[in-house]
Design a protein with these regions (language model features):
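Alpha-helical assembly-interface signal, strongest on the long, hydrophobic N-terminal helix that forms
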Residues: 1-67
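Short, conserved structural patches
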Residues: 55, 59-141
Length: 141
């Protein structure tokens, strides 16, 4: 006979105790991954929007181009934000020709995490990025 008769069923108990902990750990890994992907996508959108705005001839056109470019880049990155805010600072266009100026684009994206259905995890994570691009100092504005 087997001397370990008292251990029968212990594997089932261990599995029942460890499964929720492993699922929670997996959920944390998914949250971290989503956050990293969102940070990269928002940073790329801010960079592309600032670059697009810096190529414009005036501040009104720059703001319109930057907003459209930010939307296109976020869509291309397949990032689904619950809410998105794009702030464009075009005061660099007020500098006279020959003086340096720049355009800054700041993007805030709220990424949903509620679909993970894990207790203790946030329902959403806010990701922010900002990028500044110089305006050609000698170009007519």
């Amino acid at each position: 006979m087997n001397g370990r008769a008292g251990d029968q069923g212990s594997v089932s108990v261990e599995l029942a105790l460890l499964t929720p902990a492993l699922l929670l750990l997996l959920s944390f890994a998914v949250v971290a991954g989503r956050t990293q992907v969102a940070e990269g996508a928002v940073a790329e959108a801010a960079r592309a929007a600032a670059r697009e705005a810096s190529l414009a001839r005036d501040d009104v056109t720059a703001a319109a181009l930057a907003g459209a470019q930010a939307d296109r880049t976020l869509a291309a990155q397949d990032l689904r934000c619950q809410s998105t805010s794009v702030d464009i600072d075009t005061t660099g266009f007020q500098a006279p020709p020959g003086q340096p100026g720049d355009v800054t684009v700041s993007i805030t994206c709220v990424v949903g995490m509620a679909d993970l259905l894990a207790p203790g995890l946030p329902g959403s994570v806010t990701v922010e990025a900002s990028f500044t691009s110089p305006i050609d100092a000698y170009r007519e504005r």
